[in-house]
Structures are given as C-alpha cells and as structure tokens.
C-alpha cells in the first residue's frame, strides 16, 4: 500500500521538521531529534527508549481483547516498531493516564493517517491540532467504504446512523437530559440485541438488551434509568457519558464488528 505523505503545509522534509513551527503560537516546537520506539503496546500506544509512553492523538484503535486488537497492534508495529519517530504536539502533551499525547511521524509517513486509512483505528474528537481532523475523517470514510480492517465484516455498516447527540446541559442533574438518537436507515429490520454502544473513554460499553428496530424508525438511548419501550433504551448510569465539548459515538454489533463511528463537537454539533 502506498505511503501517506504528510499534508501541506507540513510536507517539508525531516531537517526542516526539526526547527519549524506550524501556525505560530498554536503549536509547540518539535523535538530536536527523533525518538526511538522500543516497544509497541497496542494499536495506538508505543513506548520510547527513554521509558515514556506515547498515546496517538486523534484516533482510537481496538482495545486489547476486542476484535481486531491484535491486527491493529501488528499494523502499528509494522509502521513504527524499532524505528525513529518524530512527535508533534499541540495543546496538552499529557492525557489522563499520563501518557504523552502526540501526532507521530516516521520520515514522511503520518502514522495516525496510515492506521485510519488501513482501517485499524477510528477518528476521535480529541484533536490537539485541528488541521488533521478533516484529513483523518476523509481517511476513515475511505476505509469504511472500502471495507478495510475493522470495517471489513460490517454487514450492518451504514444501516444504523446517529441522528442527534444531546449532551447534558451544564447544571442539569437528571442523567436522562443526556441522550443519543439512532435511526435504522436501512431497508430491513435490525436486531440490535447484544450490540455495544460506547464513547471515547475506556468505560464499559452499553450492551443493548433484546431489541429490534424497523426500517425508518428511531430509538433514543438515555444515559439514566427508565423503562424500556419500543423507541427508548436506558443505560442506567448516574454520571455523564457524552462529553459536552465533543466525543465519539461508537457502535459494534454482537460479534464486536464495527457498525458506525460518529464524532461530534461542542454541544453535540457536527465538527467543522
């Protein structure tokens, strides 16, 4: 497969990479030297020779134990294992697990772009550098359409869609003020029993109980508790699930295969 070249205005060569700034004031200076990868942990995390763990910004790969996790880890290893990488930062350099958060390059290869384009990772809302959001979304659409990687066995792909995301309004205490509306955009009835719905975090996903959705019909997944109906499901959580500043709604079928990935920005709006 052809390499993905770093998009302009970043296509500058490694030498210039080490001294230039992108969008003055928005991006921190790049490191003075490349860093060697000593270990590939999973599909979106590596460890450097100095012991630091680097989490790839802007994407999520399947978690260990999930379908395709081994394939995603191998794809990442093929790209960066034992190689020198250049890290590009924007905004916070740390995430909640104290791993370094960065965009990663091997020569002129944009590692996140390769993983998404090959279908081994999905795009997330967390984009320290917004210039990559559209690029990664385009790669994901290409991978989805081509049925690559995690999208290869998505027989339900494109049939279930997100129509609305309503994060909880600040100050509201009712967890059911937060919800996601899904629609069956296909032509056949969908048996959603056992399907998994999750956000960008590593918290356990919502497992859909016995439930089916006819073509053209919608259902709402509320964060709080309530009685299930033909068009309403309840997660049973008390705390916020969907981040007001933006998040990603991911749905997998009962076999763990990816059905959809919907990223939204502040207030549930579509990202620009």
Show which residues each predicted segment covers.
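Small beta-barrel nucleic-acid-binding modules, primarily SNase/OB-fold domains
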Residues: 3-6, 11, 16, 23-272
């Amino acid at each position: 497969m052809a390499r993905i070249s770093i998009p302009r205005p970043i296509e500058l060569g490694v030498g210039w990479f080490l001294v230039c700034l992108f969008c003055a004031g928005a991006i921190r200076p790049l490191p003075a030297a490349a860093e060697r990868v000593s270990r590939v942990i999973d599909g979106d995390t590596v460890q450097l020779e100095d012991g630091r763990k680097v989490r790839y910004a802007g994407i999520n790969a399947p978690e260990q134990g999930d379908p395709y996790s081994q394939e995603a880890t191998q794809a990442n290893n093929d790209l960066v294992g034992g190689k020198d990488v250049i890290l590009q930062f924007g905004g916070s350099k740390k995430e909640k697990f104290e791993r370094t958060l960065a965009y990663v390059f091997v020569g002129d290869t944009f590692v996140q772009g390769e993983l998404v384009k090959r279908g081994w990772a999905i795009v997330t809302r967390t984009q320290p550098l917004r210039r990559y959001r559209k690029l990664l979304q385009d790669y994901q659409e290409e991978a989805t359409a081509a049925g690559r990687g995690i999208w290869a066995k998505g027989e339900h792909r494109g049939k279930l869609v997100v129509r609305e995301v309503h994060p909880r309004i600040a100050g509201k205490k009712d967890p059911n003020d937060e919800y996601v509306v899904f629609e069956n955009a296909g032509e056949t009835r969908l048996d959603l029993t056992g399907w998994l719905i999750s956000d960008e975090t590593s918290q356990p996903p919502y497992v859909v109980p016995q439930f089916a959705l006819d073509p053209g019909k919608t259902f709402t997944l509320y964060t709080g508790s309530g009685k299930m109906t033909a068009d309403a499901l309840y997660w049973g959580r008390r705390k916020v699930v969907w981040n007001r500043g933006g998040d990603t709604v991911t749905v997998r079928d009962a076999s763990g295969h990816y059905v959809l990935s919907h990223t939204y920005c502040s207030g549930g709006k579509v990202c620009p």
